[in-house]
UniProtKB/Swiss-Prot annotation:
UniProt-recorded name of the protein: Homoserine kinase
InterPro entries per UniProt: GHMP_kinase_C_dom, GHMP_kinase_C_sf, GHMP_kinase_N_dom, GHMP_knse_ATP-bd_CS, Homoserine_kinase, Ribosomal_Su5_D2-typ_SF, Ribsml_uS5_D2-typ_fold_subgr
Source organism superkingdom: Bacteria
GO biological process, one term: threonine biosynthetic process
Cellular component, GO annotation: cytoplasm
UniProt keyword terms in alphabetical order: Amino-acid biosynthesis, ATP-binding, Cytoplasm, Kinase, Nucleotide-binding, Threonine biosynthesis, Transferase
Catalytic EC class: transferase
Enzyme Commission identifier(s): 2.7.1.39
Subcellular location: Cytoplasm
GO MF annotations in UniProt: ATP binding; homoserine kinase activity
Gene behind the chain: thrB
């Protein structure tokens, strides 16, 4: 028997309102991958929960394609692998499910190809493939990060921010919203004046988070001009969730990533009341308390006993 690679990969929420394509935070929902060598010629994919059944089980699987892409880049040949997957990250809901799969594929290629990539190099690869660091960076490192990917130099730089001392509430609609569809409603360009305003709001939000001034941070998050005004109509529950959250003194209610999940930052003393109120009023969605993941990917090698 051979050793097995176990990966526990967190979900992520991106943007936090005004941090479009640059700010992200890891969340305590996980993609679990159990990977081992097999004698068969083709990779085998097994899904351990029904929510994953729509995913391909052949060479069209995203994990397979990314792993082979990395192997080719470093001129290594991967063995045939059995990949068992279990996930409580809902697909196409704005919680970074594709970023988690991408990061998992990088770790698989790194281990079974014996490439010896550092976390920094894993981040560079992930961002080059994804195009922006807002999901992949917190998925790899955990916590709350801001980052920038330079497409000319293909370099990504990230900065860690103290994890906010707040409670997070996720309100997850029953329907999917593909990132591509959500991006198609965004304008191609902004005026210089509009860009300066949005940049100032984003800068102020970051400084407020650093100072643990969550009231000010939330005020800035709610003034996004990059994406939320154009996407809110795609999420019919957004206005109702935001109105209820305001009744319980929430700091901010924003779209998680491309949506449709709605993220609320709440004072800890009000979060329980708020999530129960949301469950009672917004019955079409699932609302729950979530925890910020601070450690990122957990990698374990398990040997047969």
């Amino acid at each position: 028997m051979t050793e097995q690679l176990h990966l526990k990969i967190p979900a992520s929420t991106a943007n936090l309102g005004v941090g479009f394509d640059s700010i992200g935070m890891a969340i305590d929902k996980y993609l679990h991958l159990y990977v081992k060598r097999i004698e068969e010629e083709e990779w085998e994919f097994t899904y351990l929960n029904s929510e994953l059944d729509s995913l391909p089980k052949n060479k069209d699987n995203y994990v397979f394609k990314v792993a082979q892409q990395v192997a080719s880049k470093y001129n290594v040949k991967l063995p045939s692998l059995s990949v068992e997957m279990r996930s409580d990250i809902p697909l196409a809901r704005g919680l970074g499910s594709s970023a988690s799969a991408l990061v998992g594929a990088l770790y698989i290629a790194n281990y079974f190809g014996n490439i010896q990539l550092s976390k920094y190099e894993l981040l560079q690869l992930a961002t080059e493939i994804e195009g922006h660091p807002d999901n992949v960076a917190p998925t790899i490192y955990g916590g709350l990060l801001a980052g920038f990917y330079n497409p000319d130099t293909k370099e990504t730089n990230v900065a860690h921010i103290d994890v906010p001392d707040v409670d997070i509430i996720l309100t997850i609609p029953p329907y999917e919203l593909k990132t591509e569809d959500s991006r198609n409603v965004l304008p191609d360009q902004f005026s210089h004046k509009r860009a300066v305003q949005s940049s100032a709001i984003s800068n102020t939000m970051l400084c407020a988070l650093i100072q643990h001034n969550y009231g000010l941070a939330g005020k800035m998050m709610s003034q996004d001009g990059f994406h939320e005004p154009y996407r809110q109509h795609l999420i019919s529950e957004f206005k109702e969730v935001k109105a209820i959250a305001q009744q319980y003194d929430a700091y901010a209610t924003v779209i998680s990533g491309a949506g449709p999940t709605i993220l609320t930052m709440s004072p800890k003393e009000k979060s329980g009341q708020l999530v129960r109120a949301l469950r009672k009023a917004v019955t079409t969605c699932h609302s729950e308390l979530a925890t910020i993941n601070e450690i990122g990917v957990v990698e374990e090698i398990v040997y047969p006993s």
